[in-house]
């Protein structure tokens, strides 16, 4: 019972942190490198994009799952920030619940 209440509380906290995402734009911190200014990501979920995701070290990191997520976001939502933010919310909620 305590474990379930704690999981629910953490999920609620995560939802609270992301609540304003519906009206937010892309941010200037790193979204240009990761999404809006990246031709591979903007091209969506393609075979060449998938191959690029696994060999890319752009932004100084090798993280193909992050790139695959961005590729899929652009495929599904284009450059509409709310969709990208919803994906982040789902991923963070999933990670929160994986604690249990």
Residue positions per predicted region:
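General alpha-helical segment detector with a strong preference for membrane-spanning helices
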Residues: 18, 34-35, 92, 96
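Extracytosolic (periplasmic/ER-lumenal) interhelical loops and adjacent juxtamembrane/interface segments
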Residues: 21-78
């Amino acid at each position: 019972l305590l474990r379930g209440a704690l999981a629910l509380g953490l999920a609620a906290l995560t939802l609270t942190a992301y609540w304003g995402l519906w009206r937010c734009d892309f941010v200037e911190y790193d979204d240009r490198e990761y999404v809006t200014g990246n031709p591979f990501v903007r091209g969506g979920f393609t075979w060449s994009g998938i191959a690029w995701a696994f060999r890319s070290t752009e932004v100084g990191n090798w993280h193909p799952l992050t790139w695959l997520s961005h590729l899929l976001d652009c495929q599904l939502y284009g450059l509409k920030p709310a969709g990208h933010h919803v994906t982040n919310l789902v991923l963070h909620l999933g990670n929160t619940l994986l604690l249990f």
